[in-house]
Amino acid sequence: MAMKIRLARGGSKKRPFYRIVASDSRMPRDGRFIEKLGTYNPLLPKDSEDRVKMDMERVQHWLDQGAQPTDRISRFLEAAGHTPKKERANMKKAQPGKKAVERAEEKAAKASAAAEAPAEAPAAEAAAEE
């Protein structure tokens, strides 16, 4: 049985409240779970102690049993100092493409050439006046 430690949504419309649960990965998100491990209330301030509450003993038990935490639960465990921080893959989607990089280089080259040209012009005028 593939186990997950994940969030099960509760609360009302626009007022989310989550239970941290250990459940079979094939069950629905808010469906049947094996054990409630804690709570997460995103409406509380980030520095509040009541925002995330977990029974770390039971979480460790399920991790030892082979349960896989979801991304959000992994971040909670990292913040609690329970697991080491993972190196996350930075998405390349936000970086400019090849064409945009080429255009930026061309624009920078033109700007530097334009900056050099006016600097040479006054020197030529000074030589002509003498």
Curated annotation (Swiss-Prot):
Keyword Glycosyltransferase: no
Chain positions covered by the region annotation Disordered: 80-130
InterPro entries to which the protein is assigned, alphabetical: Ribosomal_bS16, Ribosomal_bS16_dom_sf
Compositional bias per record (Low complexity), positions renumbered to this chain: 110-130
GO molecular function terms noted in the UniProt entry: structural constituent of ribosome
Basic and acidic residues composition-biased segments: 99-109
GO CC aspect terms: cytoplasm; small ribosomal subunit
Keywords linked to the UniProt accession: Ribonucleoprotein, Ribosomal protein
Pfam families tied to this protein: Ribosomal_S16
The keyword Protein biosynthesis appears for this protein: no
GO biological process, any: translation
Domain of life: Bacteria
HAMAP family: Ribosomal_bS16
NCBIfam families: S16
Family of this protein: Belongs to the bacterial ribosomal protein bS16 family.
Protein name: Small ribosomal subunit protein bS16
Protein's organism: Jannaschia sp. (strain CCS1)
